[in-house]
Amino acid sequence: MQEIAADLGRYSVDAFEFLHEGLDYTVRKIHGPPNPVADNILKWLRENGIDPDNLDALLEGAELPPTVAGAIEQMGGFAAIRDRMNRHVAGDELCWGLRDLALEKWGVMAPAVLASWGIRSTKDFGRLVFALVDNELLQKQPEDRIEDFENVYQFDKAFTGAYKISLTAAE
């Protein structure tokens, strides 16, 4: 991450670490907790250089090891496993998830913390994501574009209007 941050020159390593944490937060928020069986199947596919889109054909042709085929059947078949393996989030979804996480962590100080790392707009989130994609640390879908991160929200409004401070009477 340090090399990528140095190459870009505008973001702190902390920005990349927050992005990683925020991606996990957003994926869990949208798709629920990870499924160990689906994760193991994905790991096997990656290790064997197999495109997940080819999984159905391999399953139908009985070309999968029995343990992998059994795991797919255990999950409810190809359609069910495909849905569980899809942990993709769109650019705008990630931006909102990053905002929510920042508010949980830092409250009204969230914009200042992010700015100290070089993040001042949702486009900055996109630049971070695509730097990781370019360095093969993240994967993207064919339809994913950096423009998906442009003007998702305005920082000055998204962070200040969303955080509520509650006051309770002292006893």
Where are the model-predicted features located?
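Short acidic (Asp/Glu) and glycine-rich catalytic loops that position anionic groups and cofactors
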Residues: 1, 78, 106-109
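Intrinsically disordered, low-complexity acidic Ser/Thr-rich regulatory segments
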Residues: 59-100, 104
